[in-house]
UniProtKB/Swiss-Prot annotation:
One of its GO terms (cellular component) is cytosol. This is Secretion monitor. The lineage of its organism: Bacteria, Pseudomonadati, Pseudomonadota, Gammaproteobacteria, Enterobacterales. Regulates secA expression by translational coupling of the secM secA operon. Translational pausing at a specific Pro residue 5 residues before the end of the protein may allow disruption of a mRNA repressor helix that normally suppresses secA translation initiation. Coiled coil: none annotated. It comes from Yersinia enterocolitica serotype O:8 / biotype 1B (strain NCTC 13174 / 8081).
Amino acid sequence: MIGILNRWRQFGRRYFWPHLLLGMVAASLGVPSNLSGVPDQAAIPNTSSSQSRQNYGATNFSSLALLHDMHRRPSFSVDYWQQHALRTVIRHLSFALAPQVAYARVQEVAEAEQVQPSQIQQLALLNTLNALLTHEFKPPTIIRYTEQIKRPVLSLHKPGLWLAQVQGIRAGPANFI
């Protein structure tokens, strides 16, 4: 808590609060719905004998390690307020990163065309944010059948072949398989 207050004092409200909000929302996106505020279903009497319902209700903060071993479909949920917070933070970031160039008169057009390094960085961040927002997620493809290129082994030094060819000594079958 002290660290958060120190960061707030160092960076100020305008910079720190949107990033804190984004971090909190992003951290809560990966939490299953039974850990993110939904009442524990273990207290509800189990009328069905479904194993998945028992597994679902058995997990809470004291048994987070069981989540890894459970074979069930994950129930990740994003509620309205998380979506609203994400939209708000993205809107704030896009306005904060947009170049602050006012409408210039004809005389100031030449000065406005000279881009400062801070504006280049802001434009790069804005382009990255736009790319993240418009990127269509594609699940990774699994390549299962790959054939390795079979290269003939060309070893120059094979003592068995040398003995068979030069000395006439043969060890093993007469025909190669």
